[in-house]
Amino acid sequence: MTPMKRSVQTQVSEPFMESWGEESLPELPAEQSLTEYSDLEEAPSAHTLYVGHLNPQFSVPVLACLLRDTLERLEMPVAREHIEVVRRPRKAYALVQVTVHRDTLASLPWRLQTALEEHLILKELAARGKDLLLSEAQGPFSHREEKEEEEEDSGLSPGPSPGSGVPLPTWPTHTLPDRPQAQQLQSCQGRPSGVCSDSAIVHQQIVGKDQLFQGAFLGSETRNMEFKRGSGEYLSLAFKHHVRRYVCAFLNSEGGSLLVGVEDSGLVQGIRCSHRDEDRARLLVDSILQGFKPQIFPDAYTLTFIPVISTSETSVPLKVIRLTVHTPKAQSQPQLYQTDQGEVFLRRDGSIQGPLSASAIQEWCRQRWLVELGKLEEKMKALMMEKEQLQQQLQQHGPVSCTCCVL
């Protein structure tokens, strides 16, 4: 009985399993299924990244420029139109549309850590005292931003809210130590300063140097500050004439600065200035100022080239040329400087007067001598008052009698 029952059960179960497998689990060709899955893994997909804790001190174009450069260093090139920056008084964040593999998103933490250690400009992108927050956005951001604002008001550190996005793998803040200054400057050691400066401009690594952001506001023109846009062939055509006019005018007044690459409204734009252009500008300024009379010494002026961080990529670095004339030292007699071409210029409020005629130069000398004469008269009055006070003190004490005794 037992063998018969076992055989019957086996005969019944086998057709049942065969029929169930055929109906519910249709077999697919192995090669086709593997190919489809491999294609899905290799094809990049579109994602929206949420970048938080941006520095609200920068403007929207500057934040977009720095964020674009940051993503390029992380091997995630993004077009400018795919970056949307939202800036508020106390915070700023961005939404970035990227098309990358899932593995690339997973490797963002260690690549961002490496970039932070090598590029100081990335640290300036984050708000003070905070680290950049990267997460994949999958939902609306209104609730997320409201929650982050509430947490900031309550003193809690903001983070990704549940359900609003799938955060990328995070890393502890103590794994990002501050890079020593000696290690930061190590890459620039052993090279000429000009070469180091140009390479720093190309890679947006400005170490130990001033820098300006395109679109920044520097203020308005004053008696001691003059702005020039410097577009086109400015360096080869108009720059030498402006050097003569403004340096001579600043020397004959209280000093000042000429900034080339800044609009009259005070907005920084920068001009295309390569390393060769820097050398030509230095030689031009030195050759012109050597012909001034009275003679000008090198410590009387300073010529610097300030890098400009731009939102657009250019083959030639953008810079602002700053020619500063220091306040002339007080002289025993008034001095009137003239250019290498024998012209004299004066600085008025917001304008340049000159070249002066002979009568204008005589009038200037007369006014200067009147000023010096007034100063001498004031000194004479002060000395006369001091003399009178000393005489009064002597008269109050009276004569002093002395008695001698001879033993």
Swiss-Prot record:
InterPro entries in UniProt: Schlafen, Schlafen_AlbA_2_dom, Schlafen_AlbA_2_dom_sf
Coiled-coil ranges from the UniProt annotation: 366-398
Polar residues composition bias: residue spans: 181-190
Q: Name one Pfam family in it.
A: SLFN_AlbA_2
Segments for region (Disordered): 1-28, 137-191
Alphabetized UniProt keyword annotations: ATP-binding, Coiled coil, Nucleotide-binding
Please provide, alphabetically and separated by semicolons, the GO molecular function terms listed in this UniProt record. Answer: ATP binding
- First and last residue of the signal peptide: none
Q: Which residues are involved in binding ATP?
A: G261, V262, E263, D264, S265, G266, L267, V268
Q: Which ranges are annotated Low complexity under compositional bias? A: 155-167
Q: Which PANTHER family match?
A: SCHLAFEN, SCHLAFEN-LIKE PROTEIN 1
Instruction: Name the family.
Output: Belongs to the Schlafen family. Subgroup I subfamily.
Q: What is this protein called?
A: Schlafen-like protein 1
Which organism is this protein's natural source?
Homo sapiens (Human)
Q: Which gene encodes it?
A: SLFNL1
